[in-house]
């Protein structure tokens, strides 16, 4: 991202604690947040507590271990979700937007030219790469764990679990192109009912065994580690499943605002979750060991009386579908941001709602996710097996968030290092402990999100590096505009109409203009050199949308500024531009684009295999014509070769 773009972003300023740009009454925003933000963390009770006692490193379901695990879950929620994300990280918004890429864009303004800048950018990109691995596992484990509840209704349902889960997931991905704006209105009320049910079921069992409430004392977590050091460390790999989805609170801040999300977490979601976890523990503690060993394989659904288990399965399935929808929508949003920030090649993006700018659909991401999610379900077959693959990507991303927030505290907010260091040390210690515990899962399935993360990281960094090299090569070969204008106007024939030459750089003469003059020997009476720039902010105000310069002799330079959450529409902006003569008439305007063909070279800038990978990505990127919404019958593409 350029310093010019950062300057545009800085015009509005940014300060800690920005409340977001969501609109609506507080009550409506709280209900909306419950329906979208908390789906992932809200479905964790289906498998998190179970996995510590029936997973790959099972603990005996006795009082020491149950109270220790419950204490770890509670204090993890308090430290990681409440303190780290709600109290600290959610104050580091980028003009109201949250998420790793928004935070990275915010930091980028202060990191240019700094020694640590490149490392921080790579960390942020890796967090984005890990997100794609997580977005494949979340729908698979959530829906599968809910459908597995059918076996608590009738054991004979077991063979039907896999096909039902696959059918639900396929249907979910198939409807994405139609958008979810209409059914999305039901997400909030459904999740409100779901969380209320969690709390009621948990409270019912806590009343029967209130002794379980002593687990809220951190001493029981400490005692767990003192008496069962290795087992307690391994158990953290399952305990962390209770806080997966915490990063969604920050990522979705732009949609609902910091206050509604924080309020709904503290007042409603956190109590409901903890009541349910404590209820599961109370139920197991009330049973003899033989019964407990059977119950622990599905304690969530066994909280309900037998006659209510089928309705609970249906409700839980609806909740997991909503959680999966939030993850899929998040993947679309993150991809759009990454495209605008220059980490992913242009992809086809369609809007599924005329009334909501955030309702988008990216076919390539949708079908790619669907294939991988179905493969995961068919390969791992049970949610318990999938739990072994879950967590490592989340804990890795959380650790990176800690690194990014450290930069924000010291370099953006100006905290004293002596004050920031202890806070960051606590966050880092927790993140490292959870990440280390999850590394033990690598042989059992943890390799999958790491593999996806490294593949995505390779693609993201290859595109980012290749794109920068290509821009630099084009800039090196560019002719100064002043020289071109002085020489061309005296030798070229001028024809009626307007020619718009798009270029990625706001300096020099576009290659498409040079090629057009070389082959056609004419210039239009009005020539626009147009650059679209993406700022380090999510949105750019209309007053700063267009920068204009009159170059003389009928030549004009126009720079259109967009935020990384905005959808470029070049004709719409040009139709409102009055700075370079009469208004634009599309039927009198031609758009000239350069289509670059890459020639891999022996230059040391990139390895040959990465040059070839970048060339393949460039060939398969969506054309600038479609991405910038240019009228197809007014576009001329001119080829050029670039050696990087």
Curated annotation (Swiss-Prot):
Any coiled-coil regions, as ranges: none
Any Pfam family hit: K_trans
Region described as Disordered: spans on this chain: 1-21
Location of the protein in the cell: Cell inner membrane
TM spans (from-to): 26-46, 69-89, 120-140, 155-175, 183-203, 231-251, 265-285, 312-332, 360-380, 390-410, 419-439, 444-464
Entry's Gene Ontology molecular function annotations: potassium ion transmembrane transporter activity; symporter activity
Topology class, membrane: Multi-pass membrane protein
Primary localisation category: membrane
Keywords: Cell inner membrane, Cell membrane, Ion transport, Membrane, Potassium, Potassium transport, Symport, Transmembrane, Transmembrane helix, Transport
Family per record: Belongs to the HAK/KUP transporter (TC 2.A.72) family.
Biological role: Transport of potassium into the cell. Likely operates as a K(+):H(+) symporter.
HAMAP family assigned: Kup
Annotated protein name in UniProt: Probable potassium transport system protein Kup 2
Organism ancestry: Bacteria, Pseudomonadati, Pseudomonadota, Alphaproteobacteria, Sphingomonadales
């Amino acid at each position: 991202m350029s310093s010019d773009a950062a300057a545009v972003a800085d015009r509005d300023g940014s300060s800690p604690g920005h409340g977001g740009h969501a609109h609506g009454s507080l009550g409506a925003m709280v209900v909306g947040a419950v329906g979208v933000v908390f789906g992932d963390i809200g479905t964790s009770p289906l498998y998190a507590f179970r996995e510590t006692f029936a997973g790959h490193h099972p603990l005996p379901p006795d009082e020491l271990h149950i109270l220790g695990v419950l204490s770890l879950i509670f204090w993890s929620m308090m430290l990681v979700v409440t303190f780290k994300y709600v109290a600290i990280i959610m104050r580091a918004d980028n003009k109201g937007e949250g998420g790793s890429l928004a935070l990275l864009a915010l930091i980028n303004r202060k990191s240019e030219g700094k020694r640590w800048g490149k490392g921080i950018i790579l960390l942020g990109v890796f967090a984005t790469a890990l997100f794609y691995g997580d977005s494949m596992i979340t729908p698979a484990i959530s829906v599968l764990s809910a459908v597995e509840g059918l076996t608590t209704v009738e054991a004979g349902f077991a063979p039907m679990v896999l096909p039902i889960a696959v059918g639900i997931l396929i249907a979910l991905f198939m409807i994405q192109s139609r958008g979810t704006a209409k059914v999305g209105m039901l997400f909030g009320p459904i999740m409100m009912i779901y969380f209320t049910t969690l709390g009621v079921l948990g409270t019912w069992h806590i009343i029967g065994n209130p002794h379980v409430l002593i687990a809220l004392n951190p001493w029981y977590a400490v005692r767990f580690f003192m008496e069962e050091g290795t087992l307690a460390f391994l158990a953290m790999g399952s305990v962390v499943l209770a806080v997966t989805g915490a990063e969604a609170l920050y990522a979705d801040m732009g949609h609902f605002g910091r206050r509604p999300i924080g309020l709904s977490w503290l007042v409603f979601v956190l109590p409901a979750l903890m009541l349910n976890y404590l209820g599961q523990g109370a139920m197991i503690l009330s049973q003899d060991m033989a019964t407990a060993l059977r119950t622990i394989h599905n304690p969530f659904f066994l909280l309900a009386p037998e006659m209510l288990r089928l309705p609970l399965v249906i409700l839980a399935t609806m909740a997991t579908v909503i959680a999966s929808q939030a993850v899929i929508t998040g993947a679309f949003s993150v991809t759009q941001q990454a495209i605008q920030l220059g980490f992913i090649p242009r992809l086809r993006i369609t809007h599924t709602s005329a009334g909501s700018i955030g309702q988008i659909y990216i076919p390539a991401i949708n079908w790619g996710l669907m294939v991988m999610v179905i493969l995961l379900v068919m390969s791992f077959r049970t949610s318990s097996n999938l739990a072994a693959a879950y967590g490592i990507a989340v804990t890795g991303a959380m650790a990176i968030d800690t690194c990014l927030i450290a930069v924000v505290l010291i370099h953006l907010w100006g905290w004293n290092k002596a004050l920031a260091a202890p806070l960051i040390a606590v966050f880092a210690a927790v993140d490292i402990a959870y990440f280390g515990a999850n590394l033990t899962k690598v042989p059992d399935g943890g390799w999958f999100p790491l593999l996806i993360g490294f593949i995505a990281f390779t693609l993201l960094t290859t595109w980012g590096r290749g794109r920068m090299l290509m821009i630099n090569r084009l800039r090196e070969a560019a002719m100064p505009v002043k020289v071109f204008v002085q020489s061309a106007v005296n030798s070229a024939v001028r024809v009626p109409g307007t020619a718009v030459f798009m270029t990625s750089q706001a300096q020099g003469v576009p290659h498409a203009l040079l090629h057009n003059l070389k082959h056609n020997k004419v210039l239009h009476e009005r020539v626009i050199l147009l650059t679209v720039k993406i700022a380090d902010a999510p949105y750019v105000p209309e007053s700063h949308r267009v920068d204009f310069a009159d170059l003389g002799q009928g030549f004009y330079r126009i720079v259109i500024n967009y935020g990384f959450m905005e959808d470029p529409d070049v004709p719409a902006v040009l139709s409102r531009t009055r700075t370079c003569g009469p208004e634009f008439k599309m039927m009198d305007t031609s758009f000239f684009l350069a289509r670059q063909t890459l020639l891999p070279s022996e230059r040391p800038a990139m390895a040959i295999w990465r040059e070839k990978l970048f060339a393949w990505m460039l060939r398969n990127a969506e054309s600038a014509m479609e991405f910038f919404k240019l009228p197809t019958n007014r576009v001329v593409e001119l080829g050029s070769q670039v050696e990087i």
